[in-house]
Amino acid sequence: MEEYFNKTGYLFSGNAVFVEELYRQYLANPNSVDQTWQEFFADIKDNNVVLNKSTAKVISTNVTNKELLNNNLSSETLNNLKAKEMISAYRRNAHYLANLDPLGLEIRKTKNDLKLNIEAFGLDSSQLGENINIMDEFIGTWNCKLSELVTKLDKVYTSSIGVEFDQIENVEEKNWLYTKLETDITFTSEEKKSILNDLVEVECFEQFLHIKFPGAKRFSIEGGDASIVAMNKAIDLSMHQGVEEIVIGMAHRGRLNTLTKVVGKPYKEVIASFINGNIFPDGLNVSGDVKYHLGYSADRVRANQKIHLSLADNPSHLEAINSIVAGKVRAKQDIFVDTKRSKIKAILVHGDAAFCGQGVVAESLSMSPLTAYNVGGILHFVINNQLGFTANAADTRASRYSTEFAKIISAPILHVNGDDIEAVLKATDIAVEYRQKFSKDVVVEIICYRKYGHNEGDEPMYTQSKMYNIIKSKPTPGSIYANELVKNGIIDNNYYAKLKEKFKIRLDQEYEQAKSYKQETHFFEGYWKGISRIRGKDAITGVNKKILQDLGTKLCEIPKDFAINPKLIRLFEVRKTTLTTDQPIDWATAEQLAFAHLLCSGINIRLTGQDSARGTFSHRHSILHNQIDDTTYIPLNNLSKTQAKYEVANSNLSEYAALGFEYGYSLANPKNLVLWEAQFGDFANGAQIIFDQFISSSATKWLRMSGLVVLLPHAFEGQGPEHSSARLERFLQLAAEENMYITYPTTPASIFHLLRRQILESTRKPLIVMSPKSLLRHKYAVSKLDELGENTTFIPILDEVTKIDTNNVTKVILCSGKVYYDLFAMRTNNSNIVIIRLEQLYPFEKKLVASLLKKYNKAQAFIWCQEEPKNMGAWHYIATHLNDALKEAEINNEFKYVGREESASPAVGSLQVHNKQQEKLLMEALGDDIIKEKLY
């Protein structure tokens, strides 16, 4: 190849990328390139030379491109080649020249810095009048003077929009984007006036609140006004494209304007929350939340077209809402069978510091193209006000842009100056159309500023005096645009002031109405109609035994031409025999039967998690894989022609975003059973924000209910500190106001009833399950089919299973989970110790526990036994409840703790030490009634 470079100077340095691209084009279609290039490339092929920039030897030289050009090419062809290279270079790098900072603080690079001056391409000023004539499937069609080409490129790529499309691998997408960007967009005079009116309403509402409620936190959008107008534009464009619903997720910055101007919440309702502080009607007995965390839903109607808009409730934990919105959108798409994912879409609004600082952004983006999580692309707006509270951009990222994460999914990124509203709307137009056409994520970063501090009571001059001295005297985006319209003769000098005055009058009227406004509820509507906030009677969750046997048998029938793994053949044979001969069933079978009957009752089920399709412990096998080809078979989707859908999928290696997605999915329809399973319960704390800010508290903060099921494998089995504990204590600490169910079931019957209760009861509450590991195959951890049969239900507390004379009972042990089977196995046959299991820890059923304890009122000792260290597990939560139950049972005694000592780590790393600890707690719990021969 070096020989060819030596002979052909035009293949050096700056031309290399172009020539390589041209060569690929030639390989696809030789006639698509100039005759000269055809001859050259043919020669390369004949000599078996491979043109590949990853392997080609780089040759350095000090001579200029002009000196290297081969004289065999005509000057016109050479100029066209150079121009094509210049166009490509502008497309790749000119975003560094774009005027993106409305404050003018950025020191911009020059054309010389980026080698975008014409001399860098072997051209000079004497050639500016020469014609350029390019027809190329990658570059497009250009027929103009060189000077006009330079002017056009400067206008498109170095004005108020800078683009990064080079990370996109799909050539069609990339060419489409460049063509759209290089095509002028025009607004009529009326459209320009409408844009100005939008800016006025955004600006005036913020100023109105600032004057009426000085010092009140509202997290103003002033300085980033264009983002609200852009969202409005995106919604209108989407409506015209046939989108019927949009779910929006955003943080607190600009939220009040989004609620009113974008989503359609009455101004008086927002103002009333400032006046009286109420966000919900009296008497609901909920905690509520601050006004800039609240969501809202409404319909927007334009010219006989309607679109439903929802702004999701969210906490101050930035970017936490991302995957939740995606999950909610996916659920709605599934409800309406929007398989093209074109009718329902998501808009996410980010802050610059958060977008590049919060890891959940990368988690959520990575999920976006995956089959189980794809929503047809999300439109992202990044409001870059160049600060993160008090931190400068240089403190929060190393790159120029805050949007680098988006490149991991090859998303197009458009950076735009927030003071150029028409440029913002052009970028929005391109982004909306791209998402709808290609069904992929797209990012619009609006570079703007923040008029006040992080909130209106904060003083930014302490830390950003230079920036805020500029901001103090800076005209608003609305006034900048108004002056532009005056200059162009579209409005007169008084038009802008009149618009502001007119809108202020409206806000004054809204303010007066707000004084007497009574907050209304907009909850439990649509699919949630009929769902109760309060627990009703226990649902009967049992199913006719014959029906269960038939369903179980059907699940074991695999098509004859499907090459199933031989080990699974045996599993299904045993399972089928167990069912048909009415033998006790294991956990996996009970779960499958619960799913099967729900599916045949029209209930859709979605189960995701790391390795959930097979199951971490190889117990589920929801998806069977053909051993000959790549086909799969899902027994739960082959029960009946009229059944509902069972969707099971392995998630990406994420807890935070993955759990958030399923929580969001559960919000859309209470008639879906939605489950997320951790690989091990220990890893659930990677999603702690979802548990703390959403699952445990959304009902009392926002009146948003969820029936999500969370399966967390938990048990102390000598596997070390990261494979033992789902941190049960943390969930119990979150438990209050009957906000969720926390269970540690020990029988297949329990999980069967728990799963069915989630759908059959009148309310919806999250279900946290400390699910089994070794118990999946434990010989005693089985249930009779009668325990799942008609008129049966979930039993939160299980009494002693052996017959013991209550008058002879000396000790009562209460426990939860796997330790029960250890105690049961180690207890002597003639023991006077009873072992009682709490299958449900929260809500604590005090009356049931008390009535059971009363049976054993002659016992001298009452023990709570757990595997977890004393500072973990259920002890600190349950001790008071147990002693209260003793009082209610009129037993003058107290529960004593038996378990591991306090520890900073959940479990030891040594199996030998684990066994000694387990032996100690069993001996302490059982005393002389232990079978010593069975000790470790």
Curated annotation (Swiss-Prot):
InterPro entries attached to this UniProt entry: 2-oxogl_dehyd_N, 2oxoglutarate_DH_E1, DH_E1, KGD_C_sf, ODO-1/KGD_C, THDP-binding, Transketolase-like_Pyr-bd
GO CC annotation terms, alphabetical = cytosol; oxoglutarate dehydrogenase complex
Top-level taxonomic group:
Bacteria
In Gene Ontology terms, what is a biological process of this protein? tricarboxylic acid cycle
The entry lists its GO molecular-function terms as:
oxoglutarate dehydrogenase (succinyl-transferring) activity; thiamine pyrophosphate binding
- CDD domains noted in UniProt: TPP_E1_OGDC_like
Its EC number is 1.2.4.2
State the needed cofactors, names only: thiamine diphosphate
Query: Is-annotated flag, keyword Metal-binding?
Result: no
What is catalysed by this protein? Answer: N(6)-[(R)-lipoyl]-L-lysyl-[protein] + 2-oxoglutarate + H(+) = N(6)-[(R)-S(8)-succinyldihydrolipoyl]-L-lysyl-[protein] + CO2
Q: Does the keyword Disulfide bond apply?
A: no
Keywords noted in UniProt: Glycolysis, Oxidoreductase, Thiamine pyrophosphate
Instruction: Tell me the protein family, please.
Output: Belongs to the alpha-ketoglutarate dehydrogenase family.
**Assembly behavior:** Homodimer. Part of the 2-oxoglutarate dehydrogenase (OGDH) complex composed of E1 (2-oxoglutarate dehydrogenase), E2 (dihydrolipoamide succinyltransferase) and E3 (dihydrolipoamide dehydrogenase); the complex contains multiple copies of the three enzymatic components (E1, E2 and E3).
What job does this protein perform?
Answer: E1 component of the 2-oxoglutarate dehydrogenase (OGDH) complex which catalyzes the decarboxylation of 2-oxoglutarate, the first step in the conversion of 2-oxoglutarate to succinyl-CoA and CO(2).
* Protein name per its UniProtKB record: 2-oxoglutarate dehydrogenase E1 component
The organism is Rickettsia prowazekii (strain Madrid E)
Gene label: sucA
